[in-house]
């Protein structure tokens, strides 16, 4: 007998090569892999080992088969197919005997006709038991012999052998076996116990609620329907529906309110709502805002209080920034905010009223109540702040304080002397009269208001002013409203963030920490914030950076969406805007407040047919990138209290960009308004330049009617328009076709001269008609 490879032996015995290798190793025969050869002696030992294993495995299989009506079920079907396929191989060794009788023994009295799979299986078992001599076995019993598969089957020798794979009864038997195995129904899983409490935020879908309650969504939909709520699996449920379902199951419900940590207003609301230990609160200085009409003496009043010349530093004597100063009077501090009185600073005054405690309304005794005075009253009332009226300029001869009091009663500001509750303090800011009384009134009102703050918490407050300093970078003037601000604190200011590097008070001195109601100038931010933004100090720099970057990205997205947003409501406005001319403007200023003021004023310019489009605003000097943007968008650059850099000036000359520099806001507004009026379509006015009387008419073929005229008034020009007037009625209006003096063409014919005139597209000229000549002159728009 020749040697056999491991994989060939495994294939003949229908076992894996791995199993054969393991069996050889158990016998002490080492083989390398499935391609190794097995000698005859090893084959005999391996046959005995494999036969012993098969006998042990066959015994329970036979027992199982006999318990199920003595039939071998469908799982043996692949073995039968393999046997039939092997029977067609020509390499079966001669002398190998087939054992059909073994199949009959294992099946008892039942004929083998109905069990082709069993025949193959039992034949293999018999063949394995009789291989003691080491000879190769033939696993096929019948396929090489006609009719040998089952001698008891009628016509068995005449029917072709299909190997059992296409036997319908075999298939049915297999199906029956499957049905018999699945007769025991699976035990349904027990539902999980209900939770004691569920937590949700805003709303839940039916599927999400079912998951939280460990129940099927269909069960919840049914319960909702019984409760009168029709819902689908993906439908969101409101709080009431969730509570109804959970109450039916006996589960508690808790709604979780998510707080947006990037919303700085939340920190201010929490300060108002949370209960504070009274022992930690200390008295804080009052924040006083000085309001009033332009040139009524607000800055002069503050100048007198501080004994400085603040007014001299303002261009044109007009306050154009918010100034914050702190004074110490009678061992008590008062913080003053000096807001501009010009109408352009309405937004700044409104912002000042929101962060103030007391409003001082300055009214000139010689001027009375003015428009900005009324506006300041409305701001203070809207903020709910107490008002102290300072009647200024009482030193002037034409001063009339009683008239001021009378006018203010119309706005519900009744003096205490007249039975009201408004404090009136007559003063002269220029000469310092009545200032002591005014300061006493401020301290009195602050005591009544009981202004307190907690200095032990992290600081929160508002931005009074912001600017870009060339040497220090972004600089912001902050008013600490609560808590204490220290150097090194991580801070978020509006949409900017950073760490406080340095702090300078209103006197220009460096400080390490500031308490409530104290103005301070800080550096260390990554960008210039907006005036009026709120600031919050956080625990660590990482949190501040994340919140600041998130707020900046949201602001950028909101800005982009706002500029491009179109709805059905404003669609027609957008369509109309396409027909309107625009003045593109870039505004650069020294501080953010001036940028806002100038932008607001330019937007209010009401010139028919022209819009002001502010495409960019920023704080700092005019740089080269501003010129590039202006050149691309055909814009005018307005610099307010700033100058262009050398590179920017050179770029502006190369790109022919118009740069306008101003130090007083009135001049900037007037200049832009004048430029806008120049951009309007020209306005024309008709001007009659002369009249001529028709004395004779001549009809000429191919030319028409020629009117022989005498100029009675003014002159007739070649390019003028004409009207044909007959009996005082205009019968035609058109243009002159030809104008001749004798036989020569003439540009104009003066009074007292005769001429020949033909009119375009009109030949019905008659004697005694009057030809009136006129021109359209462009006039300046007002």
Curated annotation (Swiss-Prot):
Biased composition (Basic and acidic residues): 53-65
Pfam families, alphabetized: EF-G_D2, GTP_EFTU, IF-2, IF2_N
Keywords in alphabetical order: Cytoplasm, GTP-binding, Initiation factor, Nucleotide-binding, Protein biosynthesis
Region of interest called G3, as start-end residue ranges on this chain: 338-341
InterPro entries: EF-G-like_DII (IPR053905), IF2_II (IPR044145), IF2_N (IPR006847), P-loop_NTPase (IPR027417), Small_GTP-bd (IPR005225), T_Tr_GTP-bd_dom (IPR000795), TF_IF2_bacterial-like (IPR000178), TIF_IF2 (IPR015760)
Annotated spans, Disordered: 47-196
Record's subcellular location: Cytoplasm
GO molecular function, one term: GTP binding
Name of the protein described by the UniProt record: Translation initiation factor IF-2
Organism expressing this protein natively: Listeria monocytogenes serotype 4b (strain CLIP80459)
Gene: infB
């Amino acid at each position: 007998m020749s040697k056999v490879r491991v994989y060939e032996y495994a294939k003949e015995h229908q076992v894996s090569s791995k199993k054969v290798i393991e069996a050889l190793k158990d016998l002490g025969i080492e083989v390398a892999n499935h391609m190794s050869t097995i000698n005859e002696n090893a084959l005999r030992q391996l046959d005995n080992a494999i036969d012993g294993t098969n006998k042990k495995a066959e015994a329970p299989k036979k027992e199982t088969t006999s318990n199920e009506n003595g039939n071998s079920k469908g799982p043996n079907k692949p073995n039968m197919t393999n046997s039939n396929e092997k029977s067609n191989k020509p390499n079966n060794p001669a002398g190998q005997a087939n054992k059909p009788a073994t199949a009959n023994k294992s099946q008892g009295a039942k004929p083998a006709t109905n069990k082709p799979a069993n025949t193959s299986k039992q034949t293999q078992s018999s063949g394995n038991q009789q291989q003691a001599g080491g000879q190769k076995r033939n696993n096929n019993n019948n396929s090489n012999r006609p009719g040998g598969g089952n001698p008891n089957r009628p016509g068995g020798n005449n029917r072709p052998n299909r190997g059992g794979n296409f036997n319908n009864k075999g298939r049915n038997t297999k199906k029956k076996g499957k049905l018999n195995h699945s007769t025991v129904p699976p035990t349904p899983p027990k539902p999980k116990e209900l939770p004691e409490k569920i937590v949700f935020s805003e709303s839940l879908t039916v599927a999400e609620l079912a998951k939280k309650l460990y129940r099927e969504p269909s069960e919840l939909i049914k319960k909702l329907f019984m409760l009168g709520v029709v819902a689908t699996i993906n439908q969101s449920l409101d709080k009431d529906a969730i509570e109804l379902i959970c109450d039916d199951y006996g589960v508690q419900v808790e709604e979780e309110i998510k707080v947006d940590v990037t919303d700085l207003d939340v920190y201010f609301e929490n300060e108002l709502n949370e209960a504070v230990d009274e022992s930690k609160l200390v008295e804080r200085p009052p924040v006083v805002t000085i309001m009033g009409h332009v040139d009524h003496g607000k800055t002069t009043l503050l100048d007198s209080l501080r004994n400085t010349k603040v007014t001299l530093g303002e261009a044109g004597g007009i306050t154009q920034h918010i100034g914050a100063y702190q004074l110490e009077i009678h061992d008590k501090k008062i913080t003053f905010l000096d807001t501009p009185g010009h109408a352009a600073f309405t937004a700044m005054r409104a912002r000042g009223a929101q962060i103030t405690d007391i409003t001082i309304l300055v009214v000139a005794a010689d001027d009375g109540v003015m428009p900005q005075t009324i506006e300041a009253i409305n701001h203070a009332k809207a903020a709910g702040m107490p008002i102290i009226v300072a009647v200024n300029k009482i030193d002037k001869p034409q001063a009339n304080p009683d008239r001021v009091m009378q006018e203010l009663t119309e706005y519900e500001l009744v003096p205490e002397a007249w039975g009201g509750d408004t404090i009136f303090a007559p003063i002269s800011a220029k000469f310092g009269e009545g200032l002591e009384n005014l300061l006493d009134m401020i301290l009195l009102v602050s005591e009544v208001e009981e202004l307190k703050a907690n200095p032990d918490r992290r600081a929160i407050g508002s931005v009074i002013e912001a600017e870009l300093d060339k040497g220090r970078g972004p600089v912001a003037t902050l008013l600490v409203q609560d808590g204490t601000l220290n150097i090194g604190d991580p801070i978020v200011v509006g949409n900017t963030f950073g760490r406080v590097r340095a702090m300078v008070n209103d006197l220009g001195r460096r400080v390490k920490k500031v308490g409530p109601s104290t103005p301070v100038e800080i550096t260390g931010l990554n960008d210039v914030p907006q005036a009026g933004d709120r600031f919050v100090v956080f625990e660590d720099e990482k949190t501040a950076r994340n919140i600041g970057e998130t707020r900046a990205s949201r602001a950028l997205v909101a800005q982009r969406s706002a500029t491009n947003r179109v709805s059905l409501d404003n669609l027609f406005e957008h369509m109309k805007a396409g027909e309107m001319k625009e003045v593109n403007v870039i505004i650069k200023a020294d501080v953010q407040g001036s940028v806002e003021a100038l932008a607001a004023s330019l937007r209010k310019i009401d010139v028919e047919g022209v819009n002001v489009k502010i495409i960019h605003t920023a704080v700092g000097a005019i740089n080269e990138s501003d010129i590039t943007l202006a050149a691309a968008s055909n814009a005018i650059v307005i610099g307010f209290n700033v100058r262009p850099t050398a590179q920017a000036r050179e770029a502006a000359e190369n790109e022919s960009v118009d740069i306008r520099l101003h130090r007083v806001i009135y001049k900037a507004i007037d200049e832009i308004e004048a430029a806008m009026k120049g951009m309007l379509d020209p306005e024309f006015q008709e001007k009659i330049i002369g009249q001529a009387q028709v004395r004779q008419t001549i009809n000429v073929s191919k030319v028409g009617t020629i009117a022989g005229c005498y100029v009675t008034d003014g002159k007739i020009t070649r390019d003028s328009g004409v009207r044909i007037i007959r009996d005082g009625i205009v019968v035609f209006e058109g243009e002159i076709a030809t104008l001749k003096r004798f036989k020569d063409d003439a540009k104009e014919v003066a009074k007292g001269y005769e001429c020949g005139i033909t009119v375009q597209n009109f030949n019905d000229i008659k004697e005694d008609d009057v030809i009136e000549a006129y021109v359209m002159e462009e006039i300046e728009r007002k």
